[in-house]
UniProtKB/Swiss-Prot annotation:
A Gene Ontology BP annotation from the UniProt entry: SRP-dependent cotranslational protein targeting to membrane, translocation
Chief location: cytoplasm
GO MF annotation, one: GTP binding
Name the record gives this protein: Signal recognition particle subunit SRP54
Recorded catalytic activity of this chain's protein: GTP + H2O = GDP + phosphate + H(+)
Native organism: Candida albicans (Yeast)
Length: 556
C-alpha cells in the first residue's frame, strides 16, 4: 500500500481516542502532526492543519458530547476533512472523451470521419522521473476503458529511449510512433501526432526528453514541441521520493511550460510521498495519477477523498469495483463457467482454482486490502510476496489433480483418501496442505451458494428481501437463519482460514460488487463491527467459540 507507515500511524492516532477526553484529543493531534512531519510534509502546512483541526473541534462542540462513540465519529470526520484539504488542489484536470465518428465510403474505401479532434497529452519532467514508463501506464489505463490510444516517442536526447517505449508498447499491445534516424524531436512529435489523428485515435500521448531547469536548450525544445503538437493537456511527471521539494520543482517548471496536471511516480517505496502530494497540492496543480509499482498496471487515479480513505482504513469499495471491472474478469470463460455452476448449486475445485487465478490478476494483496474497510490494519502485517507464494502453491497443488477430481465438489477425496496422498506426492507438498485446500474449497462453496441464494440466483444483483430493515437487524437475522453467516463474514474479511486460506473468500467477494457494497454498508452502520472482527481474527479461540455458537464451521 502507498504510504503504509503513514497510514498505520494515522489510524493508530485515531484509535487511541477511547473516552474522548481533552488529553486524548490533544495527544491524537500531536501524533497526527508528528506522522505528517516524518512523511516530509511542510512544517507550515502541518501547523495550518493543526490550527484548523483545533478550531473545528471547538466549533463542533466535541467536548460536550456525552457518548464516546459520537466523539470518535466527529473527530474522525474532522480529521478526514482536513487531511483531504491538505492534499486537494481544488482544480479539476481535463478529461479525455471518445471521438464521435461516422463511417463514409470514399473511392470504394470506408473512412472514419469525426468533427472532434484527438486528445493530445504531452509528457514533461526531469530526467529519471519515470516519464516513458508512465506514458505506457497511462496508455494502458485508457485502453482498458475503451479508448483508442497511440504513443509517440519524441525523446531523441536519451540513448535507448525509443527502444524502451517500443518494448513497453509492444508488450502492452499499443500502437507507437518513433524514429531511429530522425534527430529532430519536434518533427517526430508533429508527424506522429498527425499520423494518429488521421487514423482517428481518441488519445495521443507524446513522450519528450527529460530536462533540468538549467538546460535552456532543452526547455526551448520542449516549448517548440508544444507549439507543434498543440497538446490538449500537458502532464508533468515527478519523482515522489523528493518529498516537499516537489513544490519548488513544480513552480520552476511551470514558469517555462504551462502544464495542467501532475503524475507522481515511485510512491510505493518512499516515506516522503506524503510530503510530495501536499507540496504539489499547495501549487494548485491537480495530481491526476500516482505510480505504485514497476508494472504497466501499477497506476492509480488520484482522488483526495479516496486517497485519505485508504490511509485511514475507511476503504474504497467503489474503486475496488472499478478495478475488478477493468480487469474484465467477467469475460473470462472460467469465470463464466463458475457463475453457471453456482446457479446450478455446485462449486467445483476447478471453479476454486479459477478464483485463485483471478485473485492473482488483481495485483498486490495490500493494495486490494487497502480498498476494503478495516483490512489495511490487518493486511499491512502480511507480505505480498509471501501471500502470493501461498496462493500460487495452492494452484500448483490443484494442477496435480485429475480432470475428474477438479470437476467434482470435493467429495471424491472423502470417499477415497488415497487421492489426497497421491496429489501431495505429485505436487511435492505435505498431505496437510492438500487437506487445507479441500477445507478452504468447502468454505468457499458454502459462501458462494449462500450469496447466490441471498441475491435470488442473479450474480451481481442485490435481492435481499429485508432491504428496508436497519443494517444491523438484517445482519442479525441472517446470522440466526444461516449457521454459516459468521464464517462467511470472516471469509469476506480475509480471515477464517489464515494465511492464503483467507484469499478464497476475499477473491469471491471481489468478483461480486453487490456483496462488497453490502459489506461496506454493514461496516458503516456499526463502527464496532470492524473492531470486533479484527479481534476475532487475532484471537482464534474467540472465533472458534463464535463458530460453535452459530452451528459449527459449515460442515467441515
Amino acid at each position: 500500500m502507498v504510504l503504509a507507515d503513514l497510514g498505520s500511524r494515522l489510524r493508530g492516532a485515531l484509535s487511541s481516542v477511547e473516552s474522548g477526553s481533552d488529553d486524548e484529543i490533544q495527544q491524537m493531534i500531536k501524533d497526527i502532526c508528528s506522522a505528517l512531519l516524518e512523511s516530509d510534509v511542510n512544517v507550515k502546512l502541518v501547523a495550518k492543519l493543526r490550527g484548523n483541526i483545533k478550531n473545528k473541534i471547538d466549533e463542533s462542540n466535541v467536548s460536550k458530547e456525552t457518548s464516546a462513540m459520537n466523539k470518535r465519529k466527529k473527530l474522525q470526520k474532522i480529521i478526514f476533512d482536513e487531511l483531504c484539504a491538505l492534499v486537494d488542489s481544488n482544480v479539476e484536470p481535463p478529461k479525455p472523451k471518445k471521438l464521435s465518428t461516422s463511417t463514409k465510403t470514399i473511392n470504394g474505401k470506408k473512412v472514419r470521419l469525426s468533427k472532434e479532434s484527438s486528445h493530445v497529452i504531452m509528457f514533461v519532467g526531469l530526467q529519471g522521473a519515470g516519464k516513458t514508463t508512465s506514458c505506457t501506464k497511462l496508455a494502458v489505463y485508457y485502453k482498458k476503458r475503451g479508448f483508442k490510444v497511440g504513443l509517440v516517442c519524441a525523446d531523441t536526447f536519451r540513448a535507448g529511449a525509443f527502444d524502451q517505449l517500443k518494448q513497453n508498447a509492444i508488450k502492452a499491445n499499443i500502437p507507437y510512433y518513433g524514429s531511429y534516424l530522425e534527430p529532430d524531436p519536434v518533427k517526430i512529435a508533429f508527424e506522429g501526432v498527425q499520423k494518429f489523428k488521421q487514423e482517428k485515435f481518441d488519445i495521443i500521448i507524446v513522450d519528450t526528453s527529460g530536462r533540468h531547469r538549467q538546460e535552456e536548450q532543452l526547455f526551448t525544445e520542449m516549448v517548440q514541441i508544444g507549439e507543434a503538437v498543440q497538446p490538449t493537456q500537458t502532464i508533468m511527471v515527478m519523482d515522489g521520493s523528493i518529498g516537499q521539494a516537489a513544490e519548488s520543482q513544480a513552480r520552476a517548471f511551470k514558469e517555462s511550460s504551462n502544464f495542467g496536471s501532475i503524475i507522481l511516480t515511485k510512491m510505493d517505496g518512499h516515506a516522503k510521498g506524503g510530503g510530495a502530494i501536499s507540496a504539489v497540492a499547495a501549487t494548485k496543480t491537480p495530481i491526476v495519477f500516482i505510480g505504485t509499482g514497476e508494472h504497466v498496471g501499477d497506476l492509480e487515479i488520484f482522488k483526495p477523498t479516496t486517497f485519505i480513505s485508504k490511509l485511514l482504513g475507511i476503504g474504497d469499495i467503489q474503486g475496488l469495483i472499478e478495478h475488478v471491472q477493468s480487469l474484465n474478469l467477467h469475460q473470462d470463460e472460467g469465470h463464466k463457467q463458475t457463475i453457471e455452476h453456482i446457479k446450478e448449486g455446485k462449486f467445483t475445485l476447478r471453479d476454486f482454482q479459477n478464483q485463485m487465478n483471478n485473485f492473482l490478476k488483481m495485483g498486490p494483496l495490500t493494495n486490494i486490502a487497502s480498498m476494503i474497510p478495516g483490512l489495511s490494519n490487518i493486511m499491512s502485517q502480511v507480505g505480498d510476496e509471501e501471500t502470493s507464494k501461498k496462493i500460487k502453491n495452492m494452484i500448483y497443488i490443484m494442477d496435480s489433480m485429475t480432470t475428474k477430481e477438479l470437476e467434482c465438489d470435493g467429495r471424491i477425496f472423502i470417499k477415497e483418501p488415497s487421492r489426497i496422498v497421491r496429489v501431495a506426492r505429485g505436487s511435492g507438498c505435505a498431505v496437510v496442505e492438500v487437506e487445507m485446500i479441500l477445507q478452504q474449497h468447502r468454505m468457499m462453496s458454502t459462501m458462494a451458494k449462500s450469496a447466490m441464494a441471498a441475491q435470488g440466483g442473479q450474480p451481481g444483483q442485490p435481492g435481499n428481501p429485508m432491504a428496508n430493515n436497519p443494517q444491523m437487524q438484517r445482519m442479525m437475522q441472517q446470522a440466526q437463519s444461516n449457521p454459516n453467516f459468521m464464517q462467511q463474514a470472516m471469509n469476506m474479511l480475509g480471515g477464517a482460514g489464515g494465511g492464503a486460506g483467507g484469499a478464497g473468500g476475499l477473491a469471491g467477494m471481489m468478483n461480486n460488487p453487490a456483496m462488497m457494497q453490502q459489506a461496506q454498508q454493514m461496516m458503516r452502520s456499526n463502527p464496532q463491527m470492524m473492531q470486533q472482527a479484527q479481534q476475532m481474527m487475532k484471537n482464534p479461540g474467540m472465533m472458534q467459540k463464535m463458530m460453535q455458537q452459530f452451528g459449527g464451521m459449515g460442515g467441515m
